[in-house]
From Swiss-Prot:
Signal peptide start-end: 1-18
Catalysed conversion reaction: a lipid A + a 1,2-diacyl-sn-glycero-3-phosphocholine = a hepta-acyl lipid A + a 2-acyl-sn-glycero-3-phosphocholine; a lipid IVA + a 1,2-diacyl-sn-glycero-3-phosphocholine = a lipid IVB + a 2-acyl-sn-glycero-3-phosphocholine; a lipid IIA + a 1,2-diacyl-sn-glycero-3-phosphocholine = a lipid IIB + a 2-acyl-sn-glycero-3-phosphocholine
MF annotations from Gene Ontology: acyltransferase activity
GO BP, one annotated term: lipid A biosynthetic process
Main subcellular location: membrane
Keyword terms of this UniProt record: Acyltransferase, Cell outer membrane, Membrane, Signal, Transferase
Subcellular localization(s) per the UniProt record: Cell outer membrane
Enzyme class per UniProt: transferase
Residue runs in coiled coils: none
Name listed for the protein in its UniProt record: Lipid A acyltransferase PagP
Record function comment: Transfers a fatty acid residue from the sn-1 position of a phospholipid to the N-linked hydroxyfatty acid chain on the proximal unit of lipid A or its precursors.
Organism: Legionella pneumophila subsp. pneumophila (strain Philadelphia 1 / ATCC 33152 / DSM 7513)
Record: active site: H60, D103, S104
Sequence similarity: Belongs to the lipid A palmitoyltransferase family.
Length: 190
């Protein structure tokens, strides 16, 4: 409950701060070399389409984990979230998201982040993209401390539906296995 209240307080503070900024120049207080980042995030937030995310699968690499470990892990990473996204003037995709899902140990794992995908059009309705996501998450097994990260991201876009995947690298030292998970999620643009 404390975590939920903390998250809501941070979101309200960020919204109040954003509302206080002048709408004509929302990134005026940013350091000059970071202004393009701020401007793209602001554009995504203000001009982007609303998205609904859903997740349901986390594949643990069979070359890293023993059969016993695989059986003990949750691979149905049910969850969902909301986001905003847009295709820019070059046709590349930008997204902001907040999701929560069940991790490998069936604990709730929240994540917020930004994703960028360089896309190629297969036809009018179908696009493929490769890129990255920068995010902040927290996990029970790390005492719920916010953990920043960057991950590769790939996606197929078909009209308003997207199927995406990321690979979470990890360690394969015996007795200290972690990560090495292919995480799949979907998105519907509303």
């Amino acid at each position: 409950m404390k975590r939920l209240i903390s998250c809501l307080t941070i979101i309200c503070a960020l919204n109040a701060s954003a509302a206080a900024e002048t709408t004509s120049n929302p990134c005026s207080r940013w350091i000059s070399f970071l202004k393009p980042v701020c401007q793209r995030i602001h554009q995504t937030w203000t001009e982007g389409h609303d998205d609904m995310y859903f997740s349901g699968y986390a594949w643990h690499n069979r070359y890293v984990y023993s059969n016993e470990k695989i059986k003990s892990y949750n691979e149905t990473a049910w969850g969902g979230g909301l986001g905003k996204s847009l295709f820019d003037e070059k046709g590349n995709w930008h997204g902001l998201y907040a999701i929560a899902f069940l991790d490998s140990h069936r604990h709730l794992e929240p994540a917020v982040g930004y994703a960028y995908l360089k896309t190629a059009s297969v036809n009018k309705d179908l696009k493929a993209g490769l890129g990255y996501s920068v995010l902040v998450t927290s996990r029970v097994d790390y005492d719920n401390v916010p953990i920043p990260g960057a991950l590769p991201w790939a996606a197929l876009f078909y009209k308003r539906i997207t199927i995406a995947a990321t690979y979470i690298p990890g360690s394969s030292r015996e007795g200290h296995e972690n990560g090495n998970v292919l995480y799949m999620l979907g998105k519907i643009s509303l």
